[in-house]
Amino acid sequence: LADVRAEAARIAMRRRVTLTLEETMRAAAAPSATAWQARWAAAVQALGLPAFTLPSGAGHDAMKLHEAMPQAMLFVRGLNAGISHNPLESVTNDDCDLAVRAFTHLTEQLAADLS
């Protein structure tokens, strides 16, 4: 964080603008629910694909959602070196199709479990 602040200060000085940095929120990473991770893994594996786990400390909606209910995320492989939350973020149609199919499988399993 110190490196980012220092670079921002250099840029502001070079551009002759005033820079004010203020922390407005701090939240710990949201733990994913083990049962939901297992549901996602089963949905991905049902497509004949391996399921991988990925820790994420990013500021996703899950940081607040997990306070109200269990959560887990399905990450879709990204192009452009995996850049995320940026206009350069990109995914393939095939990977989006796989994500939708995994989601469909997960929701169908939930419906079956409830009936």
Residue ranges and their predicted role:
Residues 3-4, 36, 95, 99-102:
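Hydrophobic alpha-helical membrane-association signature
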Residues 17-37, 56-63:
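A short beta-alpha structural unit
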Residues 13, 45, 66:
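Anion (oxyanion) recognition and catalysis
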Residues 10-23, 50-55, 112-115:
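Flexible, glycine/charged-enriched surface loops at secondary-structure junctions
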Residues 42-49:
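Short, basic, glycine/proline-bearing loop/turn elements
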Residues 50-100:
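Zn-dependent metallopeptidase/amidohydrolase metal-coordination segment
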Residues 1-9:
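Short amphipathic alpha-helices in soluble, non-transmembrane regions
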Residues 102-113:
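C-terminal alpha-helix
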